[in-house]
């Protein structure tokens, strides 16, 4: 890195924002950030006003969390949850829509809303849980992707190990080794 930037000392990224991304659109002031981290709060405000055309990431998958002690604590985001209810849940025929509030689905909703603010649109690219590809509850999510985007490209890496027998064999094993039984998509 240092040879590429031709310097021996660390050069911090000027606009870095240390924040909970979903919290940035919850329309409430964070007094703690304003008081103790004013430079970071200013960077967050600046980022919120900037046009964003590309969002890339690997959002966490956490809908099955049992308690606050789990590694993937579920947090409530009133505005974001409302947007999911107005879009993905409203378009779904499924009775149980709980999986639409998984963090990776929230990331899609947040990103879709964020690039919609840009008059020329944009690109969202995630490595995510692939259950949305054929899950019953995610029907509304798929409908909204079709409505909100001009093109959708998906690489289904498969890997669903929550199946058994021939179906499990066809999934081709675990994508990330022994730690994950979840199907993955890009």
Over which residues does each language-model region extend?
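Conserved S-adenosyl-L-methionine
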Residues: 1-28, 71-73, 141
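Short alpha-helical segments and helix-capping/turn motifs at coil-helix boundaries
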Residues: 1-3, 37-43, 111, 137-140, ...
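C-terminal, active-site-flanking charged/polar segments
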Residues: 1-9, 144-151, 176-186
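Extended catalytic-interface subdomain
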Residues: 15-16, 50-60, 180-186
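SAM-dependent methyltransferase catalytic-core segment centered on the flexible catalytic loop
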Residues: 22-124, 131-135, 148-154
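GTPase G-domain guanine-specificity segment
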Residues: 134, 141-144
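Class I S-adenosyl-L-methionine
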Residues: 152-185
